[in-house]
Design a protein with these regions (language model features):
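A short, Lys/Arg-enriched amphipathic alpha-helix followed by its capping loop at the start of a domain
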Residues: 22-32
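A short, glycine/small-residue-rich beta-strand->loop->alpha-helix junction that serves as a flexible
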Residues: 7-19
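Charge-rich, low-complexity amphipathic helices
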Residues: 18, 24-25, 49-50
């Protein structure tokens, strides 16, 4: 199952972004394909979080939207 998460911003130390990254890691450990997408991404997180403009942001079986 593909489970993607959308958050408005991914900043290190931000509760929503940090929680979303932890959830993504847990989903991956459980055998699911999972990625995190954001509108605004800190430079240091660009290798870990994908932009909303990525075509893969629209694929998946489940999308979790956090605000």
């Amino acid at each position: 199952m593909i489970v993607n998460q959308w958050v408005p911003a991914a900043h290190r130390g931000d509760a929503i972004g940090d929680s979303a990254r932890q959830m993504r890691d847990m989903l991956r450990e459980a055998g699911h394909e999972s990625d995190l997408y954001a509108l605004t991404i800190d430079d240091e997180l660009r290798a870990d979080v994908r932009p909303f403009s990525d075509p893969d942001a629209r694929r998946g079986d489940v999308t979790i939207v956090s605000a």
